[in-house]
Amino acid sequence: MASWSEFAADVPRLADGVRRLLQQYGPGLGYLATVRADGGPRVHPVSPVLAEEGLFCFVIDSPKRRDLERDGRYALHSFPAEESDDEAYLAGRAQLVTDPARVTRLARRHCAIYDIDWRLFEFSIDVAMIAQHDIAGVARPAVQVWLEPGDQAGSGQPGQPRRAGSAAPTVDQGSAAA
C-alpha cells in the first residue's frame, strides 16, 4: 500500500490528473465506496483532503465510518466533470489516524468543525486509474492504471502506469494527465 505522496512521487503526472478531477470544484469531492458488514457495497459522497503528506477524509459517525473502522477497504471515484466525462478512481485501505498532533494540524488546515463527531482516516493507494474521454464520446477512453509496486495482481512491472487491457505496461503519462 502506497501513501498519496509515494504514489505522486512514482507517477506525478497521473497523480496531478487524479488531483485535478478530485478538486475540480474547489474542495475535494468524490464518491466513497466501503464494504458493509454483510459484504455488500456502500457508496456515499465525501470531501477527500489531498495534502502533501497524504490523502485523508474526515468521516462523521455514520455507517460508512463503521465500515472503515471494521474493514478499511475503500474505493474513491471522482465526481463527474462538467466539461467532459473524464474520471479518476483510487482503491486501497483506509486507516484511522491516531496521532493527535497530526489530526489537529490537518483539522486546522482544512477547517474541520470540532463540535462534530468525526474521525480522520488516511487512504493508502493500491490502485489508481484515470480515464480521459474524447469530446464526442465516440472513441474508447484513454485509460491509465497504476498498481502499487507490491501489488502482484498486475502483469508486467507494477508501479508503472499502463493502459487497461494491454499485455505489457506502457508508460504513457501524457495522455491521461495533460
Which role fits each region the language model picked out?
Residues 22-36, 74-77:
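A short, Trp-centered hydrophobic/proline-enriched beta-strand micro-motif
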